[in-house]
Amino acid sequence: MTKKLLVMAGGTGGHVFPAIAVVRELQQQGWEIRWLGTKDRMEADLVPKHGIPIEFIQISGLKGKGIKALLTAPFAILRAVLQAKKIINAYKPDAVLGMGGYVSGPGGIAAKLCGVPVILHEQNAVVGLTNVWLSKIARRTLQAFPTAFPNAEVVGNPVRQDLFEIAPPEQRFAEKGYPINILVMGGSQGALVINKTVLEVAKVLGQNVFISHQVGKGKLAGVEEVYQATGNGIASEFIDDMKAAYEWADLVICRSGALTVCEIAAAGLPAIFVPFQHKDRQQFLNAEYLAQVGAAMIIEQQDFTPESLLKALEPLIADRQKLTEMAIKARAKATPLAAKRVAEVIVENSL
């Protein structure tokens, strides 16, 4: 009989893309996959585009929703659990994989009530509240970084396998001269502080660098004009081919979401991280995974000025060997078998 998996993941690419990487591993083994998500988040469009059937429940976050939302939250959660329970009873999965997002909470509770094993994966270096609760009912808990749970197995973050096809840094960087290719990623929303600061620095650095700057949707205004004037960069709203972008780059400047950190390690690239300022310092702790081994630098957002960025960049631009050493250290922290290992744990713990 065909084995079945129900995947619970949604909200952001940091949850959805690692889950898709695991799905591909299990599909190769003949597993049938179905997804549990919400209609108003990115998984509603993204998952069907990858050929995966998706079911929906109604659930949303409570942050910043006010007193009314807090008072009605128990009823909303109960409704979502009952919706998920109905889907699980109809689909009859052999295992449920929780990868984060609002959907994982009620989905995990419903799976437990239905007697279906829950396998949990935490992508960030600090564990989210939903996964703290779910870890108490999960059959197995896995983590990307060693700092989230004290006793969970560390498997890394499942990332796209094509990134591991990129040649090793010592080979890629061997014949390179100038300019230094800098890949700047403002994220899908466009991090205003990164965009503004990099533009100021581009005016100073001249032809020693060439910048490929992903600014985010609707953020091109004024940016293209700067690079036309400086002649040392190009701007785009999105990057369609991330593998090609990583292969081209000598250095990355970006936020430090869990998936981004692990992709940069997989590609073998030095980075300057500007963590988003979460209360739990989630992105800072993600960035430390590479910074602690000398593969990356961290500049906190409140300190991220043209002066601090120039101070970080100038020694790297002057010393290509330093960039190569950082890149080699980054590649050493990659986890090419993460998706395979998560898939193995699902198989081992399925009904």
Swiss-Prot record:
Keywords noted in UniProt: Cell cycle, Cell division, Cell inner membrane, Cell membrane, Cell shape, Cell wall biogenesis/degradation, Glycosyltransferase, Membrane, Peptidoglycan synthesis, Transferase
GO cellular component: plasma membrane
Any one Gene Ontology BP term: regulation of cell shape
Bilayer topology: Peripheral membrane protein
Compartments where found: Cell inner membrane
Domain of life: Bacteria
Entry annotated with the keyword Cell inner membrane: yes
Catalytic activity of the protein: di-trans,octa-cis-undecaprenyl diphospho-N-acetyl-alpha-D-muramoyl-L-alanyl-D-glutamyl-meso-2,6-diaminopimeloyl-D-alanyl-D-alanine + UDP-N-acetyl-alpha-D-glucosamine = di-trans,octa-cis-undecaprenyl diphospho-[N-acetyl-alpha-D-glucosaminyl-(1->4)]-N-acetyl-alpha-D-muramoyl-L-alanyl-D-glutamyl-meso-2,6-diaminopimeloyl-D-alanyl-D-alanine + UDP + H(+)
Gene Ontology MF terms: UDP-N-acetyl-D-glucosamine:N-acetylmuramoyl-L-alanyl-D-glutamyl-meso-2,6-diaminopimelyl-D-alanyl-D-alanine-diphosphoundecaprenol 4-beta-N-acetylglucosaminlytransferase activity; undecaprenyldiphospho-muramoylpentapeptide beta-N-acetylglucosaminyltransferase activity
EC id: 2.4.1.227
Pfam family, one: Glyco_transf_28
Primary subcellular site in the record, as a coarse category: membrane
UniProt: UDP-N-acetyl-alpha-D-glucosamine binding residues: T12, G13, G14, N124, R160, S188, I239, A258, L259, T260, V261, C262, E263, Q283
Functional pathway: Cell wall biogenesis; peptidoglycan biosynthesis
Task of the protein: Cell wall formation. Catalyzes the transfer of a GlcNAc subunit on undecaprenyl-pyrophosphoryl-MurNAc-pentapeptide (lipid intermediate I) to form undecaprenyl-pyrophosphoryl-MurNAc-(pentapeptide)GlcNAc (lipid intermediate II).
PANTHER family named in the record: GLYCOSYLTRANSFERASE, UDP-N-ACETYLGLUCOSAMINE--N-ACETYLMURAMYL-(PENTAPEPTIDE) PYROPHOSPHORYL-UNDECAPRENOL N-ACETYLGLUCOSAMINE TRANSFERASE 1
Protein family: Belongs to the glycosyltransferase 28 family. MurG subfamily.
Stated name of the protein: UDP-N-acetylglucosamine--N-acetylmuramyl-(pentapeptide) pyrophosphoryl-undecaprenol N-acetylglucosamine transferase
